[in-house]
């Protein structure tokens, strides 16, 4: 597409609007100042004689103004929904992070408790082994003492473990 392809558009613009009184020209900011209204919509102010001269143009202007107002309202509503969604997502992420931190803290406590229990288990096992070894040593010493002493009949009656009964 070259620049010459748009010549039919320029011809249509130069012909003007048929059936509408007044002159059809390109919009110029000098003739149509644009003001920003407090509600966030755009409003084009045209000279009073142009407004009164054509009810069709006035109707189109009102329709465009309403369309811009609706579009601006929809844009504000969309931005508000997006802001609410962003806040909700941030809150959900913060809740998730707090939950994750609580879980990690609970896991760390459980690991520490498990380590303490393993240590206590090891100590108990070591104590049981030591006691068992001492019991075996005492039993051997007792057996050696019994074997080295001659048994009298009175000792046999007092000691039921010998098995002569």
Curated annotation (Swiss-Prot):
One GO process term, biological-process aspect: lung development
Q: Where is this region: Disordered?
A: 136-165
| Protein name (Swiss-Prot/TrEMBL) | Alanine- and arginine-rich domain-containing protein
> What gene is behind this protein?
Aard
């Amino acid at each position: 597409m070259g620049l010459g392809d748009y010549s039919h558009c320029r011809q249509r613009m130069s012909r003007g609007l048929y059936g509408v009184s007044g002159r059809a020209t390109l919009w110029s900011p000098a003739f149509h100042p644009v003001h920003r209204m407090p509600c966030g919509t755009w409003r084009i102010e045209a000279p009073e004689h142009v407004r009164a001269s054509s009810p069709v143009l006035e109707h189109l202007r009102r329709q465009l103004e309403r369309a811009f107002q609706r579009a601006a309202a929809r844009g504000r509503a969309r931005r508000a929904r997006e802001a609410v969604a962003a806040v909700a997502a941030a809150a959900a992420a913060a809740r998730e992070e707090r939950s994750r931190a609580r879980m990690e803290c609970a896991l760390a406590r459980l690991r520490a408790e498990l380590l303490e229990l393993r240590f206590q288990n090891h100590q108990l096992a070591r104590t049981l082994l030591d006691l068992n070894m001492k019991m075996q040593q005492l039993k051997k010493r007792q057996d050696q003492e019994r074997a080295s002493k001659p048994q009298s009949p009175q000792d046999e009656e007092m000691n039921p473990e010998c098995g002569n009964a």
